[in-house]
């Protein structure tokens, strides 16, 4: 405590970020302050050189303060910089007592640029600061389905670079385009099609009706497989905004954020209203080991969503709840980011309160559906058996694959909300000369990406104690808190043997080795994770090998033999680099004379 007491006596009054650590130097909490000295001292009560929690703080905070042994601060220029740095560090380091919201992606918009002669609908996540550009969104899902439908229903220019080619393509032949590239349609005639496209984007009911007519025509012509594609697309578009029945007389442009939860779980609902209609919505389930703090969660949700400059900002942002201090901080953050004032408020009456109540009702409904399933029970049991500090709600699983140390690759699969999240899978080309170096490279590259993609609760490594120790060293150097287990495959590893429940794999943790019965659900859960990562890595290895074989065949056609190919690969590192190299460079490597 002497170190902590000394730190408390020498605090700066500047703006900055503070970090609390326990006696083992494990990160407990990250916060920010306009005045570090004032904020940090508010956590503690110091009498006769004895430090105790401030009794005016919440029980959750008092529990954390009792564990604090060290603190560190980072000074910045102003409160806005502190707010952004705090959010970035929380996502990268995942402290024990901070709430981590993962959904920080920028949602896509559909836009049309009417400053060009033949405008087409496109998807963007970035701002195009120029006149004549019309945006629609944001879309939390279904934007691509809308776009595909528009191109199939209307004779639009099908590709961005079509006009430059000055020659009609196959889309003209199949009557999907009017060939403005060959002046077969005037600008004025095409503009009517573009305006019809706008109407379909603005009125999803009309778009769905056109899709239904197309589906019926296909069914009538016995083209059932194509009709099924339209059926599925209609279903996706219908789900885009489950609240579209809401239509306010006032043409509000609003973003709505509502939290519902308690203890260690909560649900965030986001709704986006444009022109008085809810056009899209999304939700996120949040799990926290050490209690749920609405104020902290709301702050992180707003910063995550608005940190990237968005094309269409609302007139007002409605929040279900937060403190006056946080509301003021967020107001200043938004004004600073967008150089204009956009009001943030917690509605107390009228239409806007009704919108918050609808968002809260939906959050409550999603929360109530979170009943304990068999999978949830297995997660709890795994946490207890493997002595994990928190329930592994999000897991990343790693495996490598190679053939005689060639075509070395690695794969990462992600398991969250009791399902594999294939959009989050990642593939890596590796350079390591053995399985340990390859795993080290794979895990290091993932750890270096923590700032962009926050770390999970748990890493599962395909390997033994050696691979486990590699992972622990990498995580220690990254400063992030992620728990790790490893599973080593039994030598007898046939699929038939495993399917009969005969596998006796071993699970390694920091302090124990577990040899569980094949019928143990906790073992089967870890095996399921490992087998998916193995499948993913193997498939990537096969596709890489096939691609390399094709590249070798192409080089052979150019008169370069296998031995020469190996020399070139050793020097340039990849087939892509070989292709880019000049003949002079390749000849120098092969020591050929002109």
UniProtKB/Swiss-Prot annotation:
Described function: The UvrABC repair system catalyzes the recognition and processing of DNA lesions. UvrC both incises the 5' and 3' sides of the lesion. The N-terminal half is responsible for the 3' incision and the C-terminal half is responsible for the 5' incision.
Name recorded for this polypeptide: UvrABC system protein C
Cellular location(s): Cytoplasm
SUPFAM superfamilies xref list: C-terminal UvrC-binding domain of UvrB, GIY-YIG endonuclease, RuvA domain 2-like
One GO term (biological process): nucleotide-excision repair
GO CC, alphabetical: cytoplasm; excinuclease repair complex
SMART domains hit by this protein: GIYc (SM00465)
Domain of life: Bacteria
Keywords, alphabetical: Cytoplasm, DNA damage, DNA excision, DNA repair, Excision nuclease, SOS response
Domain UVR: 205-240
InterPro entries per UniProt: GIY-YIG_endonuc, GIY-YIG_endonuc_sf, GIY-YIG_UvrC_Cho, RuvA_2-like, UVR_dom, UVR_dom_sf, UvrABC_protein_C, UvrC
Record GO terms (molecular function): DNA binding; excinuclease ABC activity
Main location: cytoplasm
Subunit structure: Interacts with UvrB in an incision complex.
């Amino acid at each position: 405590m002497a170190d902590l007491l000394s730190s408390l006596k020498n605090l700066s009054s500047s703006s900055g970020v503070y970090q609390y650590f326990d006696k083992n130097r494990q990160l407990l909490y990250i916060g920010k302050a306009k005045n570090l000295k004032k904020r940090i001292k508010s956590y503690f009560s110091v009498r006769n050189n004895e430090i105790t929690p401030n009794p005016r703080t919440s029980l959750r905070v008092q529990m954390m303060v009792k564990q604090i042994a060290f603190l560190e601060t980072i000074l910045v220029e102003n409160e806005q910089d502190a707010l952004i740095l705090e959010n970035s560090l929380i996502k990268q380091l995942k402290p024990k007592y901070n709430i981590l919201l993962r959904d920080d992606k920028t949602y896509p918009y559909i836009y049309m640029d009417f400053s060009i002669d033949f405008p087409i609908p496109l998807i963007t996540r970035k701002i195009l600061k120029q006149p004549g550009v019309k945006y629609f969104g944001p879309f939390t899902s279904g934007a691509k389905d809308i776009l595909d439908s528009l191109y199939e229903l209307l004779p639009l220019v099908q590709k961005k670079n079509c006009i430059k080619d000055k020659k009609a393509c196959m889309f003209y032949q199949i009557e999907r385009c009017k060939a403005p590239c060959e002046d077969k349609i005037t600008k004025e005639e095409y503009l009517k099609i573009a305006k019809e496209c706008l109407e379909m984007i603005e009125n999803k009911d009309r778009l769905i009706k056109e899709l239904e007519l197309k589906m019926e025509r296909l069914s009538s012509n016995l083209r059932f497989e194509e009709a099924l594609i339209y059926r599925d697309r209609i279903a996706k578009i219908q789900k885009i905004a489950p609240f579209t029945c809401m239509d306010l007389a006032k043409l509000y442009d609003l973003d709505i954020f509502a939290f519902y939860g308690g203890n260690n779980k909560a649900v965030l609902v986001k709704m986006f209203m444009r022109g008085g209609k809810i056009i899209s919505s999304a939700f996120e389930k949040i799990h926290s080991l050490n209690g749920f703090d609405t104020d902290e969660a709301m702050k992180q949700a707003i910063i995550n969503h608005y940190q990237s400059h968005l094309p269409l900002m609302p007139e007002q942002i409605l929040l279900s709840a937060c403190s006056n201090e946080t509301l003021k901080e967020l107001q200043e953050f938004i004004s600073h980011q967008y150089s204009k004032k956009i009001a943030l408020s917690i509605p107390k009456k009228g239409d806007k309160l009704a919108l918050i109540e609808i968002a809260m009702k939906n959050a409550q409904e999603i929360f109530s559906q979170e009943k304990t399933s068999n999978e949830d029970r297995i997660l709890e049991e795994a946490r207890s058996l493997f002595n994990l500090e928190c329930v592994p709600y999000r897991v990343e699983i790693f495996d490598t694959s190679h053939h005689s140390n060639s075509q070395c690759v690695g794969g990462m699969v992600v398991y969250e909300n009791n399902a594999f999240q294939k959009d989050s899978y990642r593939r890596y080309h590796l350079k390591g000369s053995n399985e340990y170096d390859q795993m080290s490279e794979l895990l290091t590259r993932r750890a270096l990406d923590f700032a962009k993609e926050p770390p999970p609760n748990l890493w599962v490594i395909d390997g033994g104690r050696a691979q486990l120790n590699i992972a622990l060293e990498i995580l220690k150097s990254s400063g992030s808190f992620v728990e790790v287990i490893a599973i080593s495959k039994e030598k007898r590893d046939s699929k038939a043997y495993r399917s009969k429940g005969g596998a006796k794999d071993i699970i390694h943790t920091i302090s124990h080795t577990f040899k569980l019965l094949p019928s143990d659900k906790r073992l089967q859960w870890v095996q399921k994770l490992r087998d998916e990562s193995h499948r993913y890595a193997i498939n990537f290895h096969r596709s890489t090998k096939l691609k390399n074989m094709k590249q070798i065949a192409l080089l052979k056609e150019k008169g370069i033999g296998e031995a020469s190919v190996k020399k070139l690969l050793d020097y340039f590192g990849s087939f892509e680099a070989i292709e880019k190299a000049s003949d002079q460079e390749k000849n120098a490597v092969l020591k050929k004379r002109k």
